[in-house]
Curated annotation (Swiss-Prot):
A Gene Ontology cellular-component term: membrane
Membrane disposition: Single-pass type I membrane protein
The name this protein goes by in its record: Uncharacterized protein KIAA2013 homolog
Alphabetized UniProt keyword annotations: Glycoprotein, Membrane, Signal, Transmembrane, Transmembrane helix
Leader sequence segment: 1-40
Source organism per UniProt: Bos taurus (Bovine)
Extracellular face of the membrane: 41-589
Primary location: membrane
Taxonomic placement: Eukaryota, Metazoa, Chordata, Craniata, Vertebrata
Length: 634
């Protein structure tokens, strides 16, 4: 009865304005508390996704297993050293001779420097499949500093149904990946790479971690575990304790009608991989690829046997050499060479416009171009004489890079690449651009020279006979970036364009000594001040940005002090301005569109005013200018 009376009085209570306000305030407070609580629950749930020490998965759902296995990628991505695969990021691993698309499972071979890449009808990698469709989670990443693609898959264990097999551990059955609970996961990690120091070699490393109490099994699908590809014949080679498959065939004709003979040696792999409970499997599959020069199909029959014999002997010899090496040593050798090759580069610090490529775009472009470039300097078969010749070619300054900077050339630094074929076309464009801009010597040196030319071109650096000059456009220094590892004599120079607290740009230069100490000097535009000796001090050296009239380079670097001192007398400048003074002169004030809009509004206003006056005195029913005394209507 009391409750009924209170409910009858509720409409009257709510009719009060202060009561409605209080009710709305309480409702808003409840909503805020609910959202805060759900956010805290989500945060707590996110922390619980990593239940395994050191990133090792245990019994959990595939998504939680994947989160733990890929947790270390986050810091690599923040440093620009790793890129997740996705739209606009082709899954390419290459070494200048071999190019492999991991996702599409395709192989390209470049027979010669000026020959187009050929695509043999050969499936390059082994595919690992569970024995039945099971829930799984996976992710792939390009590790730019290691030169490989890593794919991680977390596979949830299948159930084998009722019966003795489901009661305890046992071999995998055809009904699932494993026997046992459906909440157990195994971690599969695969590394794909084309070896940087051995141009004919690529490999796939398979690591399967089974932390459960059951046996895990995966079926292998690929040329090393099944029948030979359609265009190839295969033979099993046995030498001592080693055995491998030798495939022989030919590539499809290139547009000119010529064909190439192809021989592939591949390590033999079993049809099914099984891992005992609480153990790990580490298996490395090796391939060696050799191709012939272009052959006319009409003379192929007469030359095929002899050419194939030569290619088979080369592939057999290299495969036996690889099988004698520990697989871990082969992988570490590749990572060491790739890290050495990728030490120079471009670091984007702050971008203030839409036309400058992002750090991700720059790093991906450098990775793809390095992958497509041969590196003869890294070959173990190179003689000392040949190595010295290539080193001298790489250290020869030439006149690279002539012309304006390529920083804003969107066709050279594309924000999106759709396929491996597009990457190969981009590499041809980069090579042609560098050759036409005075970098022929660097291009001949292979991947280290290509990278040096790309770094020089990005910032507008150019070597001359006596110095290295930084000739960036003063109007585009609002972006902050750093160029690392520029070869000069026997040292490496790092040059950065930075901004102070007021937004004014300045230059920061540091030197990394490599071997014999050589004095290096630098002076800013005009060289009016005495050149400064660059040292390997950690803090480096800073230079203000000065702009000359007419425009000359912003910075000069040389080992010849007298040359820099003489420059001030040979430049013949009209004026030297600070960067902000130059920009003030370049700034035309308000944009043209603003003034055009103001002028249009003023014109329209006067036209409207003229129309009013015209309608008042000249339009229909307009009043006369003078009164007529005889007109009674006036």
């Amino acid at each position: 009865m009391w409750l009924q009376q209170r409910l009858k009085g509720l409409p009257g209570l709510l009719s009060s304005s202060w009561a409605r306000r209080l009710l709305c305030l309480l409702g808003l407070l409840v909503l805020l508390l609910w959202f805060a609580g759900s956010g805290a629950r989500r945060a707590a749930g996110g922390l619980q996704l990593l239940p395994w020490p050191h990133g090792e998965p245990g019994a959990a759902e595939p998504s939680a297993c994947l989160e733990a296995a890929t947790h270390a990628w986050r810091s690599l991505r923040e440093r620009g050293e790793a890129v997740l695969l996705g739209p606009g990021v082709p899954s390419l691993v290459a070494n200048g001779f071999l190019a492999l698309d991991v996702v599409a499972n395709r192989l390209w071979v470049t027979p010669g420097e000026r020959e187009p890449a050929v695509a043999p009808d050969f499936v390059p990698f082994v595919q690992l499949r569970p024995l039945s469709a099971l829930p799984e989670a996976g992710e792939s990443v390009l590790l730019l500093r290691e030169g490989l693609l890593r794919r991680v898959r977390c596979l949830q264990l299948g159930t084998s149904g009722p019966g003795p097999a489901a009661a305890g551990p046992g071999p995998a059955s055809a009904s699932g990946l494993l026997t046992g609970s459906g909440r157990d996961c195994v971690l599969l990690q695969e590394d794909f790479l084309a070896h940087r120091g051995r141009p004919h070699v690529y490999l796939q490393r398979i690591q399967l971690n089974n932390p459960t109490e059951r046996v895990a099994a995966l079926q292998t699908v690929g040329p090393t575990a099944g029948p030979a590809p359609r265009a190839f014949t295969s033979t099993l080679e046995k030498v001592g304790d080693h055995q491998f498959l030798l495939y022989s065939g030919r590539s499809p004709p290139v547009p000119t009608g010529l064909v190439h003979l192809v021989v592939v040696a591949a390590k033999k792999l079993v049809d099914r991989l099984q891992v005992a409970p609480r153990t790990q499997l580490d298996e490395t599959v090796l391939w060696v690829v050799h191709v012939s020069g272009p052959l006319n199909p009409q003379v192929l029959k007469s030359k095929a046997a002899k050419e194939l014999k030569v290619l088979q002997d080369l592939a057999r010899k290299e495969m036996l050499e690889l099988l004698e090496m520990p697989a871990a040593e082969l992988l570490q050798d590749h990572q060491r060479l790739w890290a050495q090759l990728f030490s120079p580069g471009v670091e984007m610090k702050k971008i203030t416009d839409a036309h400058t490529p992002s750090g991700l775009t720059v790093n991906l472009t450098l990775y793809y171009m390095l992958s497509c470039s041969p590196a003869p300097l890294l070959s173990p078969d190179l003689s000392h004489r040949e190595r010295d010749q290539m080193e001298s070619t790489l250290n020869y300054e030439d006149h690279c890079f002539s012309g304006h900077a390529t920083m804003h050339a969107e066709n050279l630094w594309p924000g999106r690449l759709s396929s491996v074929q597009q990457i190969l076309q981009l590499w041809d464009l980069w090579r042609l651009t560098l050759q036409k801009r005075g970098c022929k010597g660097l291009v001949r040196a292979g991947a280290p020279g290509i990278l040096q030319g790309m770094v020089l071109s990005f910032g507008g650096l150019q070597f001359t006979e006596n110095h290295l000059q930084f000739q960036a456009d003063p109007d585009v220094l609002h972006n902050s970036y750093a160029l690392h590892g520029i070869r000069y004599k026997n040292d490496h120079i790092n040059l950065a364009v930075l901004a102070d607290a007021e937004g004014k740009p300045y230059l920061h230069v540091s030197v990394e000594s490599r071997g014999q100490l050589v004095k290096i000097y630098a002076c800013e535009a005009g060289c009016l001040d005495e050149p400064v000796e660059l040292t390997s001090a950690p803090q480096g050296h800073t230079f203000s940005v000065m702009v000359t009239q007419p425009i000359t380079p912003l910075l000069y670097i040389s080992t010849d002090l007298t040359h820099l001192q003489d420059l001030r007398h040979t430049l013949h400048l009209k004026a030297i301005l600070a960067h902000d003074e130059h920009m003030a002169q370049q700034d035309p004030g308000l944009p043209f569109l603003f003034w055009f809009s103001v002028a249009s509004l003023i014109t329209l206003f006067h036209l409207f005013l003229f129309k009013l006056i015209y309608n008042e005195y000249c339009g229909p029913g307009a009043k006369p200018f003078f009164r007529n005394k005889e007109d009674p209507s006036v």
